[in-house]
């Protein structure tokens, strides 16, 4: 018996050993396979690892991959998680290498630089959580792969990428899926009607924010929608005037955000909102909703916490039923047309409200004292209404809100004094009472508020002084904006304790005394405005210690002493973005000496643009221009000030040569002082300078030739000095009017008298000289007569040998003010190019003006092929047989010259197949000529709109029109995104799209173009650009040209191609309408087919494609600039439709590597 048991034990031992050996071998193999897959991911997907995150990802015998950085394993050694968040990895993501891991459940790769690529058709995966957010993934097939293969998926986040294309199918089979986030991508086209309803019932979170998705909102089906708690379609292109009938099925929704779309019509009434049991946040902001706010919306009051209806066209009042919103904390009704007494009768009874925004409405009467009942109120914004009476004094009493942080009542009609009771609001951080009619002093209690960061009360009639002791109890004050008041006294020394100060504006008051040197201790100070006061003493050298200073305005004071060279040594070196988040307006003085200073920067938060007309600097000056919506910034390295105005003082001494090192300086005004010495040659380093005023000083010496290289210079004034010598030829110096050089007795050259000709002396001096030199004059006269006789004989001999045509040409040339030559460019230049230089990089050969004159038959009408706002275009055949187009700029003082220089500095150095090449230039006296490559078919305007005329218009089928649309878009995209700095065209129109012999579109006429970069965004606009019918609506408000303005103009061109109609045609659209208005109305009414040219509909081109292009045109023509696509996104849309089938590396670059331009101002959100 014992032997049997022993045998059994031995068999069990061997069996167990065999099983364990086999199992161990499998474990080893599985571990090896998982390690190999991770190494394959590192090898195939990671091209750059700057932080050496994967440094320990190396195969070592005996050691598994569980110890590798970012890898997590189960207890039995299987890889279940990979976390490489924010590691800085770059490469092309091959997701299959990771999803092949059989036990991988959690994959976190967000915050890297992965692009899409590799195989997206792998086998099944077992991921539960996938986070690829904040990368550069563009291929939507990766989303389809994840939805189709990862059957256990619970959460997927691919937000903040560059996904393009249409939304695919919804993963109805993923029964565990709860979260899908595809926000902040470039997804486009119509949302499939069943896309939302096809998701499994488990879905709780769906975010499609900030794409280009379109379609009628009412067509969407939400199905049963049982568990959905978060749904956002904000910042898309949804339209329609009704809400989906199945949306109330989502009974458990907590957040519904469909803001920033194109929704029209009225908010649903009736019981539509009664089904929502848990809705806490509803945002319908920034659409086109109209009518009155329905009382039935208050059915949400039992749970509603946040309600945002701002940026629509609602009228009337907030219904009384909203008093039941006991949980409501955030109410935003701004930017509508609301009126009435609802603040008193309704809002004041919602005692739990914390944030109240009703700015930009039509509410009048007194500010209701009953608002003090809202004891939890933190932010009160009543800006830009019609409030009258006094500022309420009841806030922060024992019974009212002790937590009030912001009170904003700017741009109203309040009167009386600033209540001292506001000093009881110990939590107050921001007070903005600007643009009212307040009087009296600012109470001392307000100055002592411990948490006050923003004190803004400009444009009132405030009196009194700024008390000593500011910031003694703490340096929290960041912005002190009290300009345009009646303040007296001196600037207190204690202001130097405001160590967080960013912006000080005390200009246009009655301040006296000296500028405190302690201001130099404010290392965060970015803007200092003390102009138009009676300040005296020296400019403190300590201001050079303000390392963030970018804006210094000291004009119109009584300052003396030398200009401190320290201002150029350290300014603008740190604190990038130190004043971001502020809204500004710059009022530029263009009226010469009638108004002092270069202009003024004003805080623009909560101010309607039309109210700026009240400012003395606007209505008192003969010519001013207002730039609004600006965002100021500083530079992280090698920066400088961008604005320095110390004009109308009594400063003396020399100009420090270091001022020429301020490479970001855009405005330098030293005029009307007592400055001596010479203009530093280092001023050639002011590469961003736009306005340079050195007038009315005692400067001597020559104008430095280096000034001729300042490409951005649009206004120069050196008049009333003692300058001598010639005005440097070249650049823009010869294009400024005579008045800019006047009263410098020794200056000569264009536009003044020619150098070498003596200035005319007084009559008495000439008579005296004549009496002394009679004999000499007689002898000189005889000699001169003999010489003239000899020259006449020689001239007659030469004339007999010259043809009549040559005679006429020579006489014409001799009649010109000065002689000149043409420069002809032989070879191309690589693209893209930096265009900050004033000369071409390739050799030039000479052509005489006579050659161009001969080629155009004296610029006769027979050779003229077109004309525009800035000149005429002639066809010219040169002696070598080549045909060119010559643009002769009109001779308008200043404008033609500025046009000429702008052309030379931009298009002359740019080569692209969809741009008209500038071949050469010519400048002869007052003549300004540009020589272009000749385009056989002329302009799109002529070809498209003159089919039936005798001017050679021809029929364009859809294939030709599509080719033209894509070519023009490609050229404009090149200007916006590949030129460094970027270029805004400013005058895109069909007459500026030329067609070569192959009907390839070429964008032409950059006469209105200005370089756009971080240096030139806000101060460089000198004329309102554009042609009627093509000008975007925002240009009439801010006068600021933007890339999105070009996109709008391109949308008009695309609409022309689709409709065959002109942008403005009173016979077609009436006197009060145009093509855009007509098309938008039809599009809203779902009559888009009526927009299309009948010739295209019968052209077998495919209605679907036509409507795709019509939808793109509609997006380009959105009234809101931020809703328009960029040209990169447009090219991506064309590529998605496979419209651009050519191999185009630059297009691929646009599609996959989009970089933001200078950010355009969006509608301000609280």
UniProtKB/Swiss-Prot annotation:
One Pfam family matching this protein: Island
Keywords assigned by UniProt, alphabetized: ATP-binding, Cell membrane, Glycoprotein, Kinase, Leucine-rich repeat, Lipid-binding, Membrane, Nucleotide-binding, Phosphoprotein, Receptor, Repeat, Serine/threonine-protein kinase, Signal, Steroid-binding, Transferase, Transmembrane, Transmembrane helix
Coiled-coil blocks: none
Membrane topology category: Single-pass type I membrane protein
Signal peptide range in chain numbering: 1-21
Record Gene3D superfamilies: 3.30.1490.310, Phosphorylase Kinase, domain 1, Ribonuclease Inhibitor, Transferase(Phosphotransferase) domain 1
Cytoplasmic topological segments: 798-1166
Tissue-wise expression: Predominantly expressed in vascular tissues. From 7 day old seedlings, it is expressed in the columella cells of the root tip, in the vascular initials in the meristematic region of the root and in vascular tissues. After germination, it is expressed in the stele cell and in the early differentiation zone of the root, where the expression continues from the root to the hypocotyls and cotyledons following the midvein. In mature plants, it is expressed in the vasculature of the leaf, predominantly in the midvein, and in the vascular bundles of inflorescence stems.
InterPro entries assigned: BRI1_island_dom, Kinase-like_dom_sf, Leu-rich_rpt, Leu-rich_rpt_typical-subtyp, LRR_dom_sf, LRR_N_plant-typ, Plant_RL_S/T_kinase, Prot_kinase_dom
Topology Extracellular: residue spans: 22-776
Membrane-traversing stretches: 777-797
GO cellular component: plasma membrane
GO molecular function: ATP binding; protein serine kinase activity; protein serine/threonine kinase activity; steroid binding
Chain intervals for the UniProt region annotation (Disordered): 1142-1166
Motif (Cys pair 1): 66-73
Phosphoserine found at: 1022
Major location (coarse): membrane
Residues the record marks as active site: 987
Entry's free-text remark on domains: Contains two pairs of conservatively spaced Cys (Cys pair 1 and 2) possibly involved in forming some heterodimers. A 70 amino acid island between the 19th and the 20th LRR is essential for the binding of brassinosteroids.
PANTHER family named in the record: LEUCINE RICH REPEAT FAMILY PROTEIN, EXPRESSED, SERINE_THREONINE-PROTEIN KINASE BRI1-LIKE 1
Purpose of the protein: Receptor with a serine/threonine-protein kinase activity. Regulates, in response to brassinosteroid binding, a signaling cascade involved in plant development. Binds brassinolide. May be involved in cell growth and vascular differentiation.
Protein name: Serine/threonine-protein kinase BRI1-like 1
Gene that this polypeptide is encoded by: BRL1
């Amino acid at each position: 018996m014992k032997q049997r048991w022993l045998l059994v034990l031995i068999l069990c031992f061997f069996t167990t050993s065999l099983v364990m050996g086999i199992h161990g071998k499998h474990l080893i193999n599985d571990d090896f396979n998982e390690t190999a897959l991770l190494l394959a991911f590192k090898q195939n997907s990671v091209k750059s690892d700057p932080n050496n995150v994967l440094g320990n990802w190396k195969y070592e015998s005996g050691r598994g991959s569980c110890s590798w950085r970012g890898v997590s394993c189960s207890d039995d050694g299987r890889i279940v998680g990979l976390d490489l968040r924010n590691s800085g990895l770059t490469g092309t993501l091959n997701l299959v290498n990771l999803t092949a891991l059989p036990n991988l459940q959690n994959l976190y790769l967000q915050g890297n630089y992965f692009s899409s690529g590799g195989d997206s058709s792998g086998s099944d995966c077992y991921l539960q959580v996938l986070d690829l957010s904040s990368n550069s993934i563009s291929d939507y097939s990766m989303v389809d792969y994840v939805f189709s293969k990862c059957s256990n998926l619970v959460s997927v986040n691919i937000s903040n990428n560059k996904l393009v294309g249409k939304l695919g199918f919804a993963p109805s089979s993923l029964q565990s899926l709860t979260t899908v986030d595809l926000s902040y991508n470039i997804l486009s086209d119509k949302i499939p009607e069943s896309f939302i309803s096809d998701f499994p019932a488990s879905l709780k979170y769906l975010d499609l924010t900030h794409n280009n998705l379109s379609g009628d909102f009412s067509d969407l089906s939400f199905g049963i929608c049982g568990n959905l708690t978060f749904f956002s379609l904000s910042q898309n292109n949804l339209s329609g005037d009704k809400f989906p009938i199945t949306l109330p099925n989502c009974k458990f929704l907590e957040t519904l955000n469909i803001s920033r779309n194109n929704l029209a019509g009225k908010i649903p009434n009736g019981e539509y909102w009664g089904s929502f049991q848990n809705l806490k946040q509803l945002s319908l902001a920034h659409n086109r909703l109209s009518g009155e706010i329905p009382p039935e919306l208050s059915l949400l009051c039992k749970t509603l916490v946040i309600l945002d209806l701002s940026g629509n066209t609602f009228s009337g009042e907030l219904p009384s039923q909203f008093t039941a919103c006991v949980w409501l904390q955030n109410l935003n009704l701004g930017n509508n047309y609301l009126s009435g007494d609802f603040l008193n009768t309704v809002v004041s009874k919602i005692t739990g409200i914390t944030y109240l925004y009703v700015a930009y409405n039509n509410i009048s009467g007194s500010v209701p004292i009953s608002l003090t009942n809202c004891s939890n109120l933190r932010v009160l914004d009543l800006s830009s209404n019609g409030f009258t009476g006094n500022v309420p004094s009841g806030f922060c009493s024992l019974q009212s809100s002790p937590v009030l942080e912001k009170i904003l009542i700017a741009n109203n009609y309040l009167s009386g004094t600033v209540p001292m009771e506001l000093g009881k609001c110990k939590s107050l951080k921001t007070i903005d009472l600007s643009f009212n009619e307040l009087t009296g002093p600012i109470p001392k209690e307000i100055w002592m508020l411990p948490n006050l960061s923003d004190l803004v009360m400009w444009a009132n009639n405030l009196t009194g002084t700024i008390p000593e002791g500011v910031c003694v109890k703490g340096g929290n004050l960041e912005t002190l904006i009290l300009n345009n008041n009646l303040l007296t006294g001196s600037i207190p020394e204690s202001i130097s304790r405001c160590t967080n100060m960013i912006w000080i504006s005390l200009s246009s008051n009655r301040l006296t005394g000296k500028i405190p040197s302690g201001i130099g201790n404010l290392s965060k100070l970015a803007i200092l405005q003390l102009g138009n006061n009676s300040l005296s003493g020296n400019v403190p050298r300590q201001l050079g210690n303000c390392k963030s200073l970018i804006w210094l305005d000291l004009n119109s004071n009584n300052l003396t002493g030398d200009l401190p060279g320290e201002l150029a040594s350290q300014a603008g070196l740190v604190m990038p973005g130190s004043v971001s988040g502020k809204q500004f307006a710059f009022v530029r003085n263009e009226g010469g000496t009638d108004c002092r200073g270069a202009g003024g920067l004003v805080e623009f938060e909560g101010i309607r643009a039309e109210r700026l007309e009240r400012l003395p600097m606007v209505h008192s000056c003969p010519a001013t221009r207002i730039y609004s919506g600006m965002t100021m910034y500083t530079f992280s390295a090698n920066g400088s000030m961008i604005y320095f105005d110390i004009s109308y003082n009594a400063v003396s001494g020399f100009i420090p040569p270091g001022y020429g090192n301020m490479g970001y300086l855009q405005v330098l005004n030293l005029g009307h002082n007592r400055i001596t010495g010479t203009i530093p040659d280092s001023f050639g380093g002011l590469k961003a300078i736009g306005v340079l005023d050195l007038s009315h000083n005692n400067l001597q010496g020559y104008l430095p030739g280096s000034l001729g290289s300042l490409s951005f210079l649009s206004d120069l004034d050196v008049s009333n000095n003692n300058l001598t010598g010639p005005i440097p030829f070249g650049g823009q110096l010869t294009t400024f009017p005579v008045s800019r050089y006047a009263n410098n007795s020794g200056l000569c050259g264009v536009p003044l008298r020619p150098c070498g000709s003596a200035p005319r002396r007084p009559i008495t001096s000439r008579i005296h000289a004549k009496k002394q030199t009679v004999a000499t004059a007689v002898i000189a006269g005889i000699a001169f007569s003999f010489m003239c006789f000899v020259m006449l004989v020689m001239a007659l001999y030469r004339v007999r040998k010259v043809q009549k045509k040559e005679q006429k040409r020579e006489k014409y040339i001799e009649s010109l003010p000065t002689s000149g030559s043409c420069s002809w460019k032989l070879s191309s230049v690589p693209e893209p190019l930096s265009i900050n230089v004033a000369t071409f990089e390739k050799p030039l050969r000479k052509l005489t003006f006579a050659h161009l004159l001969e080629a155009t038959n004296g610029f006769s009408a027979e050779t003229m092929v077109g004309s525009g706002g800035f000149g005429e275009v002639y066809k010219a055949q040169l002696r070598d047989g080549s045909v060119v187009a010559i643009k002769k700029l009109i001779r308008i003082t200043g404008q033609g010259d500025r046009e000429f220089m702008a052309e030379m500095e931009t298009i002359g150095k740019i080569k692209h197949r969809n741009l008209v090449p500038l071949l050469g230039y010519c400048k002869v006296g007052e003549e300004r000529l540009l020589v272009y490559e000749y385009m056989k078919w002329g302009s799109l305007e002529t070809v498209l709109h003159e089919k039936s005329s005798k001017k050679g218009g021809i029929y364009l089928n859809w294939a030709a029109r599509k080719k033209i649309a894509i070519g023009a878009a490609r050229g404009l995209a090149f200007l916006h995104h590949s030129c460094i700095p970027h270029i805004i065209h400013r005058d895109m129109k069909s007459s500026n799209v030329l067609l070569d012999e192959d009907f390839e579109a070429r964008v032409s006429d950059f006469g209105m173009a200005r370089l756009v970069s971080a240096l030139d965004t806000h101060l460089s606009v000198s004329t309102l650009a554009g042609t009627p019918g093509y000008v975007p609506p925002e240009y009439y408000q801010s006068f600021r040209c933007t890339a999105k303005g070009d996109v709008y103009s391109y949308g008009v061109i695309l609409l022309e191609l689709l409709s065959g109609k002109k942008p403005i045609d009173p016979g077609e659209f009436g006197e009060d309408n145009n093509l855009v208005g007509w098309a938008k109305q039809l599009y809203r009414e779902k009559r888009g087919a009526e927009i299309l040219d009948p010739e295209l509909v019968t052209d077998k081109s495919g209605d679907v494609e036509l409507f795709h292009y019509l939808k793109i045109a509609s997006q380009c023509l959105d009234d809101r600039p931020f809703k328009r696509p960029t040209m990169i996104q447009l090219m991506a849309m064309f590529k998605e439709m496979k419209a651009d089938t050519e191999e185009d590396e630059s297009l691929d670059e646009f599609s996959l590597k989009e970089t933001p331009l200078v950010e355009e101002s969006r509608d301000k959100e609280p």
